[in-house]
UniProtKB/Swiss-Prot annotation:
GO terms for cellular component: endoplasmic reticulum membrane. The keyword Cytoplasm does not apply. It comes from Macaca fascicularis (Crab-eating macaque). This is Endoplasmic reticulum membrane-associated RNA degradation protein. It is found in: Endoplasmic reticulum membrane. It holds the Pfam family DUF4209. It comes from the Eukaryota. It is a multi-pass membrane protein. Its main location: endoplasmic reticulum. The chain crosses the membrane at residues 378-398, 575-595. Keywords: Developmental protein, Endoplasmic reticulum, Membrane, Transmembrane, Transmembrane helix. May play a role in neuronal migration during embryonic development.
Amino acid sequence: VLIGDPITTCLSPSVYDIICNLGFQLRENCDINSIVTQNGEVCWKTITDCVSYTESDQGLDYWGSVRLLGPVCEAVHSHFLSLTKGQFEIRYAPWFQWTSFPELFPEIFDALESLQSPAISLSLMKLTSCLERALGDVFLLIGKECPFLLRDLLASEELAQVFGQSVMNVLKVFVGSPCGLNLRNVLWHGFASPEEVPPKYCSMMMLLTAGLGQLLKSYLQKTKLTLAHRSFITPTNLEDLIVFPDVTYEVLSVLEEAMTKSAFILKIMLPYWEVALVKFKSHRFADCAILLLTQLETGLRNVFATLNRCPQRLLTAEILAKHLNDGKINQLPLFLGEPAMEFLWDFLNHQEGPRIRDHLSHGEINLHEFSKETTNQLLAFSVVLLLRFVDEGLLSVFKEKASVELLISLAEGYSSRCHPVFQLKKQVLSCEESIRVWALLPFPKELTWEAVRLEDNSETNACHSLITKMTDELYHHMPEDHCVLKDLDHLPTETWPQLLHELCSTPVRTLFCPRIVLEVLVVLRSIGKQCHRVSGQVTIASELRHRQWVERTLRSRQRQNYLRMWSSIRLLSPVLSLILFLITLELVNVHAVCGKNAHEYQQYLKFVKSILQYTENLVAYTSYEKNKWNETINLTHTVLLKIWTFSEKKQMLIHLAKKSTSKVLMKT
């Protein structure tokens, strides 16, 4: 797929020029003492005077600014290289304390001293993410909602109020605009090779960070405000994403060889992969993940541009989208296959996924606490991906290793763990397990007869009759190759767990779900959430009343309420199980909603929202504050009639989906 002339840069000519050439055009020497004092205090005027503006003074002249700032950056870089680490820490360490990660900066100093290009690029990535997080904290001294994008943050009036507009303009030149050096985006999106990032820009960004700390100190003293750091976030649903085993030394040796043989890796980017491996072996898991994420994007962008025959898009492509800008189908998902695309979407894009790249690049994760398990998953996936781009002979040799064969097998069987479909399945099974606990709730034997007598009323009996009819109806819509009871006149309660587990094991297409499907999933998930809340409230209320009964602290009214509650529970258990069954069947057939016209869709949405309304009312009525157990019976009867009426119209998704004639009898 990737046979062609070697790629020498992933930067456009103009971006290459501004980063690699423009800041070196002026050869004049700049006196370091005019930039920073012996005590490490930044002389901002020298720096801000280098920023150029357009003739109308309405905007920044980015090219002119980069050109003038070049000698300043050179002087700063030489200055840092002339210091010992001890001197650096004495002069500058206090001015990094305003960031939430001050210990990063001595590491960056070490990277600059090492003169190793990949380490300097990695340092610059970590510096920009740390700076963005710290600037967000400063923004919140005045503002209320911190902008998500760094460029919007740098353009905010709040930061200009703290640091001054001329200082913010300096930052815009380095990291705040695609018209400037744009160092953050160029590195975090994997465009710049190690040799294309001048180390002097890393040195300059470090000095600017120290200078911002000095300006902030003055501002805080003047305003009597206190800077508070937001807590780091913990990425969500990571436990669901652990599908690959720990990477072994055997797998690492395969990766080391594959890196030099796989067409997926651009030769100019190979040093990043080599450093990523070193970082993994030395337990620097966040560093490894940062490098892997950026280089996976680089490699995938190259495959994207090749498959879609748009080499110019190597510079800009949005690689995970379904369509290209011209409306044509993106060939990358077809080539990689759904499992690989699902993995990428889970880790990078899904709102309920860990969104590792986003959180790392915005400085929201504590790098020291970044988990080995997460990096393991990225590394294992990278191995499988690289092997897609080696020749058949070498692939056969690698596949002889059991550990490699296992990784490939697991990757090929991957399905989304962060898509709303998976989350709804997880929710249903958790709720079913919660409802199952009701059968174990204690109830005084001496009250059993009274509770049974309360159940014997026409409305409760009508509810049970409707539940039986609907269970029979729904059972006929089990998907192909799933079980059907021999005797549909009676559904034993012990079959519900097996039934729901089987349904939740049914594959549902998740990649590039249409908006209409996602809208339905939102409502179905809301129903599941409310069912779970009801289940939890019932358990707590029952345990409380039983404890009061045992301790003989139940008053007469509370005793009657306890009986009504128990009577209600015996109805709510099959009702909630039925609703879980219904929403899971609808989930399995959710793509059938695309076959509805606008009117039919609105009617369907109205129907599922009526079930949601019922579950929300149940939450209210079963709460400790309201305790309206009798009213739940009338609510339940009403919603069961609605469900049955709508089912009779054959407008549920189970009615629209194609019926399979293949059925398997379940042993009863």
